């Protein structure tokens, strides 16, 4: 930049600021935009010490629930900031209650926005469910599959996007009853996405769990999801309570039928960033990497197959 010395001091300062700003933006874009063929892991506090030393190269991004991190200070807060400055992060909320009959908690959404801004996180998703009525419930309840609920939920989604100044991504959830349903789950999910014009976090394990519990064809449900709206994927393990009752726990290894459904998803919808969820019975990182590397392998297999088909 020797040529800068030939310019007026005020022009030098302006250009240097521009170079700095461009570099900062490129840095943010680099560590916050994993490619389509990428695999992430849900970050938990017990992982901080290890990952602040070194993050395995197989982990392309992390995901956190902002509610668990946005008031965190001290050592954990410093470690978290260190990681968000160096690695890509997605946020997946727990308590927005997008389908609630109560007014939207705009103060809470503003707090989410501040957290996202502070850590340069652009991806924010939530559950297509609700967890508040006359008070806060400590579980995610299914929104009634009705036309009125579609319109109500879509209106709230647009409110959230206006506050966040970011696209809002909705996840298909596991559920165990559907009172008052006027349409199927897949029809409801598609209707909300269309009405709100928003993206989908497609949870492959939830499709499998619901297909067993409600006796529908998981492959048909998967095929009915809108490819162009898929932002990224979740995959996890679950607990088999009975042969016809699965519980979405994120506390076990992924089983073969769910792996098969993930491969079908890549074949039907293409490869998307895929996050491994593990919330309970968390094994050592070496064990988690077995599943992370399995996802990488399935992504590469799908990309290879797509390349062959394009050349045929």
List each model region and its residues.
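Acidic-and-aromatic substrate-binding clefts and catalytic sites of carbohydrate-active enzymes
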Residues: 48-49, 66-76, 97-107, 177-182, ...
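Acidic/histidine-rich catalytic cores of soluble enzymes
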Residues: 161-245
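Conserved, mostly hydrophobic/aromatic
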Residues: 62, 124, 203, 233, ...
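Gly/Pro-rich active-site loop or hairpin
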Residues: 73, 103, 140-150, 211-269
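Acidic (Asp/Glu)-rich catalytic clusters
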Residues: 53-56, 75-91, 107-122, 161-162, ...
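N-terminal pre-domain/capping segments
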Residues: 26-114
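Short, Lys/Arg-enriched N-terminal segments with co-localized hydrophobic residues
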Residues: 11-25
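Active-site acidic/histidine proton-transfer and metal-coordination neighborhood
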Residues: 105-200
């Amino acid at each position: 930049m020797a040529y800068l010395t030939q310019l007026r001091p005020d022009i030098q300062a302006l250009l240097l600021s521009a170079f700095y700003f461009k570099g900062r933006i490129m840095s943010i874009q680099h560590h916050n935009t994993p490619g389509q063929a990428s695999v992430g892991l849900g970050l938990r506090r017990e992982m901080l010490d290890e990952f602040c030393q070194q993050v395995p190269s197989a982990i392309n991004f992390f995901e956190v629930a902002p509610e668990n991190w946005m008031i965190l200070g001290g050592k954990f807060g410093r470690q978290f900031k260190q990681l968000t400055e160096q690695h890509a992060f997605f946020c997946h909320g727990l308590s927005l209650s997008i389908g609630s009959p109560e007014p939207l908690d705009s103060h809470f959404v503003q707090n989410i926005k501040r957290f996202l801004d502070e850590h340069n996180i652009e991806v924010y998703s939530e559950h297509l469910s609700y967890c508040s009525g006359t008070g806060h419930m400590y579980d995610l309840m299914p929104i009634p599959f009705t036309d009125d609920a579609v319109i109500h939920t879509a209106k709230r989604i647009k409110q959230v996007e206006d506050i966040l100044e970011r696209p809002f991504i909705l996840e298909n959830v596991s559920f165990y009853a559907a009172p008052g349903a006027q349409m199927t789950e897949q029809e409801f999910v598609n209707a909300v996405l269309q009405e709100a014009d928003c993206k989908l976090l497609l949870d492959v394990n939830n499709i499998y769990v619901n297909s067993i519990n409600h006796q529908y064809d998981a492959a048909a449900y998967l095929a009915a999801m809108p490819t162009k709206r898929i932002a990224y994927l979740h995959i996890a393990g679950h607990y088999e309570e009975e042969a016809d009752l699965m519980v979405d726990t994120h506390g076990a290894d992924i089983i073969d039928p769910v792996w098969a459904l993930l491969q079908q998803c890549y074949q039907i919808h293409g490869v998307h960033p895929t996050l491994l969820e593990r919330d309970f019975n968390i094994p050592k990182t070496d064990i988690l990497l077995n599943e992370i590397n399995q996802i990488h392998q399935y992504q590469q297999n799908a990309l290879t197959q797509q390349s062959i088909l394009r050349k045929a």
